[in-house]
Amino acid sequence: MERTFAIIKPDAVERNVTGKVLAMIEEGGFKIVGMKKIRLSKCQAEGFYYVHKERPFFGDLCAFMSRGPVIALVLEKENAIADWRGLMGATNPANAEAGTIRKALGVSIEENTVHGSDSPESASYEIPYFFNQLELV
């Protein structure tokens, strides 16, 4: 079994679509092995998204991710990383395929509802950024 990291972003929490996202996750065959609602500080968001530090959108991304609560998740299933990327859909909801979370619930490129690890290396950094081993069941 493979694990991946996911975030339900502040825009989705604000719009009260968390339950819809969780339902789509479970319908997609994922087991939720870790979940917590947190509010990131700007510093925590900067640490989490450090790989984008030199990108022009870094400041806006960190401000967005720290504007309100998020739901941090660890998901488990065979091929979890690729399957979660597929269920999320394209970054821009306008380009996402029908049946994906971003097509169904995303608003814009920034307010696109969810984040997910893009590789095993990313997941191995992102999961322990939010969860310790005792919190994963």
Curated annotation (Swiss-Prot):
Species the sequence originates in: Citrifermentans bemidjiense (strain ATCC BAA-1014 / DSM 16622 / JCM 12645 / Bem) (Geobacter bemidjiensis)
Cell compartments where the protein resides: Cytoplasm
Listed PROSITE patterns: NDPK, NDPK_LIKE
Functional description taken from the UniProt entry: Major role in the synthesis of nucleoside triphosphates other than ATP. The ATP gamma phosphate is transferred to the NDP beta phosphate via a ping-pong mechanism, using a phosphorylated active-site intermediate.
GO molecular function: ATP binding; metal ion binding; nucleoside diphosphate kinase activity
Upper taxonomic lineage: Bacteria, Pseudomonadati, Thermodesulfobacteriota, Desulfuromonadia, Geobacterales
Superkingdom: Bacteria
Name of protein: Nucleoside diphosphate kinase
Cofactor(s) the protein requires to work: Mg(2+)
Residues annotated as the enzyme's active site: H115
Protein keywords: ATP-binding, Cytoplasm, Kinase, Magnesium, Metal-binding, Nucleotide metabolism, Nucleotide-binding, Phosphoprotein, Transferase
Catalytic reaction equation(s): a 2'-deoxyribonucleoside 5'-diphosphate + ATP = a 2'-deoxyribonucleoside 5'-triphosphate + ADP; a ribonucleoside 5'-diphosphate + ATP = a ribonucleoside 5'-triphosphate + ADP
Top EC category: transferase
